[in-house]
Amino acid sequence: MTVATNVNAAGVDREVATQELNRELQDKGFLLTSTEDIINWARTGSLHWMTFGLACCAVEMMHTAMPRYDMERFGTAPRASPRQSDLMIVAGTLTNKMAPALRKVYDQMPEPRYVISMGSCANGGGYYHYSYSVVRGCDRIVPVDVYVPGCPPTAEALLYGIMQLQRKIRRTGTIVR
């Protein structure tokens, strides 16, 4: 009797009601979820990344794809074309001459697209911050989702940045309403 009253009561938290229903249906082999949750789950487990390696950080990025760290176990796969990738990893010093090329490649990526800025130079100019030819952070050219600090950052730091991006995708969602 009280269960029926609580379900119809005004102000009941939908999340709690959904969790209770999930527990009941789980015993019978069913799962209750939304389409958006399924899409976000699939998107976090299938990031296709493209490198924009500009300097020393690109070497550390290559380490993450090798057998010791094996980035693919986190559900990421390298792609050579921006039209096939949804994650761009900017690694290294971005110069004023290279900035239009970075923006052009970013614009060729399909939506939703994500950017990881890897290393001090990509994050804010790094050692060359005061040079006339260096962009002081790739976030002045493209929107950045995750910053990975270091000079150069370790392969573990990049893997942690990818896991943070996956967490962000799960948390924020990707469907535009």
From Swiss-Prot:
| Uppermost EC category | translocase
* Subcellular compartments: Cell inner membrane
Is Acyltransferase included in the keywords of this UniProt record?
no
- Gene3D superfamilies xref list: 3.40.50.12280
Annotated coiled-coil positions are none
Enzyme Commission number(s) from the entry = 7.1.1.-
Q: Which UniProt keywords apply?
A: 4Fe-4S, Cell inner membrane, Cell membrane, Iron, Iron-sulfur, Membrane, Metal-binding, NAD, Quinone, Translocase, Transport, Ubiquinone
Cofactor requirements of the protein: [4Fe-4S] cluster
Its recorded reaction(s) are: a quinone + NADH + 5 H(+)(in) = a quinol + NAD(+) + 4 H(+)(out)
- Positions contributing to [4Fe-4S] cluster binding: 56-57, 121, 151
> What's this protein's family per the entry?
Belongs to the complex I 20 kDa subunit family.
Output the HAMAP family linked to this UniProt entry: NDH1_NuoB (MF_01356)
Q: How the protein assembles, per its UniProt entry?
A: NDH-1 is composed of 14 different subunits. Subunits NuoB, C, D, E, F, and G constitute the peripheral sector of the complex.
Protein name (record): NADH-quinone oxidoreductase subunit B
Task: Give the originating organism.
Answer: Roseobacter denitrificans (strain ATCC 33942 / OCh 114)
Starting at the broadest rank, the lineage of the source organism is:
Bacteria, Pseudomonadati, Pseudomonadota, Alphaproteobacteria, Rhodobacterales
